[in-house]
Every structure is written in C-alpha cells, then in structure tokens.
C-alpha cells in the first residue's frame, strides 16, 4: 500500500513537471544558448531556426552555462535565414530573458533615466525606436516599448511610449545577473534575478510593437553616441518569447540550464532518490 502511494506521488510530480515544461517552452520565439564555441554565426536552437551574425570583435568565452559571447565593439544582428515572404521575427508581445555579465556599470543618473548599454534593440522607423532593453542609469536597467501605428512615421515627440527606468538596482561590474523584460500589451515588467523589480501600465492608446525591415541587434546599438550604447560584457542563454512570461516562468527559465528541457531528468532523479528513502 505504501509503495502504491509513492508511485502515485511520482506520477503527480511528473504531470506537474511536464506542465511546467509546456509553460516555459510555449511561445519560444528564438533561443540562443551561445554554445558554438567558435565561428561568427550563432544558432537559434528553437523551432524557427533564426541566426545571429556576430561582430568581428565578438568572441566565445566561458559563460554562465557552457560558453557565452563577449561583446566589446559592436552588436550581433539577428537574421531570418529563410528567403522570401515577410520575416517571422516580428511579434505582438514579447519577453527578453538573458544572463548578463557587464564589464562596466555607471552609477550616474542620466536624463530621463536613459540607457547606455543596449542588450536587445530594434529600430521601428528612420529615427524612432521599437524595443530597447539594457543597462540603465544609476546602476539599473531600462526597458522601452514604442507606440504608434503599423506604418511607422518619423519620430514624433507626441508618440506614446512606455519607458520603465529602474535606477539604483545596485548592479556591479563583473557579476552575473539574470535580467528579463516583458510586454503583454497592457503593462511592461522588469525582473532581476527572478524578482519583479518594477512594472508600468501601458497607456490606453498604445504602445504596440512596431517591426519593419530594420535589424534586431543584441549586444549594443550601433553607430550612435560614439559607442556609448554598445554593451560591453558577456551575454549568455538568450531566450525570446512571443508572449509575456509569468513570475513563476521567469524563475523557471532563470534556474534552467537548457530551456528546452528545464532539467527534467535531474529533477526526476532527485525526487525519485528522495522517494526511495521513504
């Protein structure tokens, strides 16, 4: 009878764990663990098969999990290798999650809390921005989603956007941090090491995601401010979703060494070992 109880307990655990796996893998847009170890192209190991072309200065180094990319003088460019038709890179909602190891952190508070080191960046028009996620002023983080219409016009100061600037988070150079920005159409949120650090409601008339033919960059915003918006440091385990993750999912992603498996085998082995001692 006792053995039947523990078999049932294992079954319940397996069902619950598979449910978590389904939640964390649902909506993966691209996942780049950066474990190639060499070369100038990194692969999306998710279902869509995107790629990132690295800057000449980028190099593979020991990372948080396996290897990471060291950025210093220029960003990587995300591309859709499939020819023809509209790009599949564009989404309505968004989560960007990544491990960062910055070489430089500024304790200065800049005007409007703007950022100085872009982690993830896309431009929506000739002079306006669509998405910005990066290091912010005052040892903090910065998350920006633009507003507007499907056919983006040149920059208009009256455009509604949602900027979540979180200074004074205490970021220090040469430390690993797991950072996450989410946007679900109703609010934006920023997480640091699995903790929700801030959120902001989206204005009633915007913003929306404004994608076009402009490149998506990771590891810096090129050709602006004499390089001030280039990220200098390591990035590892970049995963982008086409939806906003929940807090529990953010923690699960942070604790995973492979988003596509969520360490199921290790969890099952550990749990079965505990059950056998009962």
Can you annotate each of these PLM segments?
Residues 1-7:
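Bacterial N-terminal signal peptides that target proteins for export
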Residues 7-19:
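Bacterial N-terminal signal peptides
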Residues 21-51, 61-245, 265, 269-278:
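Extracellular glycan-associated modules
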Residues 202, 255-258:
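A generic structural signal for secondary-structure junctions
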Residues 258-266:
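Feature responds to low-complexity, polar/acidic, surface-exposed segments characteristic
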């Amino acid at each position: 009878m006792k053995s039947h109880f523990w078999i049932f307990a294992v079954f319940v655990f397996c069902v619950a764990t598979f449910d978590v796996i389904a939640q964390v893998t649902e909506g993966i847009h691209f996942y780049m663990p950066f474990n190639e170890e060499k070369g100038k192209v990194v692969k999306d190991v998710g279902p869509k098969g995107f790629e990132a072309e690295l800057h000449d200065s980028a190099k593979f180094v020991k990372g948080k999990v396996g290897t990471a990319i060291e950025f210093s003088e220029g960003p990587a460019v995300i591309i859709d290798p499939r020819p023809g038709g509209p790009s599949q890179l564009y989404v309505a909602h968004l989560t960007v999650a990544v491990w960062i190891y910055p070489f430089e952190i500024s304790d200065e508070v800049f005007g409007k809390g703007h950022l100085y080191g872009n982690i993830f960046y896309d431009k929506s028009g000739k002079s306006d921005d669509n998405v910005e996620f990066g290091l912010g002023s005052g040892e903090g983080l910065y998350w920006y989603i633009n507003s507007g219409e499907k056919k983006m016009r040149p920059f208009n100061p009256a455009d509604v956007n949602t900027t979540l600037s979180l200074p004074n988070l205490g970021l220090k150079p040469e430390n690993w941090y797991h950072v996450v920005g989410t946007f679900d159409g109703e609010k934006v949120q920023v997480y640091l090491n699995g903790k929700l650090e801030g959120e902001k409601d989206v204005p009633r008339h915007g913003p929306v995601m404004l994608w076009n033919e402009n490149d998506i960059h990771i590891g810096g915003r090129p050709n602006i401010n004499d390089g001030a918006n280039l990220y200098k440091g390591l990035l590892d385990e970049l995963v982008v979703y086409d939806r906003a993750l929940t807090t529990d999912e953010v923690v699960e992603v942070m604790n995973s060494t492979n988003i596509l498996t969520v360490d199921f085998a290790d969890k099952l082995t550990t749990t079965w070992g505990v059950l056998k001692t009962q």
